[in-house]
């Protein structure tokens, strides 16, 4: 397990600007108490009820839960992704396009695009999700950050034809799939790798065994990839820290695990 304290830098200033804009936008119609309660409810759904299937869109059915996801959850996802960009040296990837599967608000792909190597400006974004609100929010994220991208309302199992210098990112989304579609996704990712794609799978560190993860890790490593567990100590904006504490949560240390597969011939 790798641990690193995160310091202020130019990339996090972009994070700070995005967070403030998003937080201000969503708290125009919500009080601090309402956002705190929504964050607790959403946390309960994602953390304590992962073993129970939920109807599509159930987690984001209310304005409060959408606000919590767009501000609190997305902020922590960005901060973890920024740590991975440093540790896995993802900024060295020469990318034309980042395809984010189950993109949510698009922050993880955006964090990567802002720092990835490109001769023609930041990598273009393609976000795939089954939630219309999430796709709309992803577009807002990208526009605010000066990124270009398009969204597709479909299952994350179905992604566009892969070309050279494409990256496929699945951040906190593979675990949400049923077993059948998840197996199909892995087959499609293997094909994408053979076509030259960079692949990154990011998930929370599980409190209990997750059978699919071990199987995926074995196959990714057989293809030359790596499996890692990470933790970092992020610098939290004050509103985020206050919401986190009031919700009875403690994200002073973020933890995640990854499967990372570079194109053949890349070291």
Segments and roles (model prediction):
Residues 2-55:
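N-terminal auxiliary segments of SAM/dcSAM-dependent transferases
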Residues 183-195:
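A short glycine-rich, Lys/Arg-flanked "PGG" loop and its adjoining helix->strand segment in the class I
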Residues 105-120:
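Conserved SAM-binding loop of SAM-dependent methyltransferases across substrates and taxa
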Residues 195-204:
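Conserved beta-strand signature within the Rossmann-like core of class I S-adenosyl-L-methionine
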Residues 166-180:
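A short SAM/SAH-binding and catalytic strip from SAM-dependent methyltransferases
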Residues 57-84:
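Class I SAM-dependent methyltransferase Rossmann-like catalytic core
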